[in-house]
């Protein structure tokens, strides 16, 4: 198992690629919340932990938190992010 860090910015529709979005706009989520993301990860049956008091490096003034998720070694970060977006729609 490996750990993936998931910042809400990675799947946020309002962000550009330069601002940190990693998924295509077609599947990105409008204003994703940490609690909503964690809920979907839990439903997927994956082990995770939430870090609430952390700020996204590109926006160090804003505390948004992130989620650490344990996934299979064969799962890429982008593949996992796309799966989360599809599950949240």
UniProtKB/Swiss-Prot annotation:
SUPFAM superfamilies: SRP19. GO terms for cellular component: signal recognition particle. It is found in: Cytoplasm. The keyword Disulfide bond does not apply. Pfam families: SRP19. It comes from the Archaea. Part of the signal recognition particle protein translocation system, which is composed of SRP and FtsY. Archaeal SRP consists of a 7S RNA molecule of 300 nucleotides and two protein subunits: SRP54 and SRP19. This is Signal recognition particle 19 kDa protein. It comes from Methanococcus maripaludis (strain DSM 14266 / JCM 13030 / NBRC 101832 / S2 / LL). The gene is srp19.
């Amino acid at each position: 198992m490996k750990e993936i860090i998931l910042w809400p910015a990675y799947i946020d529709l309002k962000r550009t690629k330069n601002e940190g979005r990693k998924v295509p706009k077609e599947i990105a989520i409008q204003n994703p919340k940490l609690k909503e993301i964690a809920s979907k990860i839990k439903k997927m049956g994956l082990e995770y932990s939430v870090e609430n008091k952390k700020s996204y490096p590109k926006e160090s003034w804003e505390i948004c938190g992130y989620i650490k998720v344990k996934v299979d070694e064969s799962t890429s970060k982008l593949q996992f992010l796309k799966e989360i977006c599809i599950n949240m729609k």
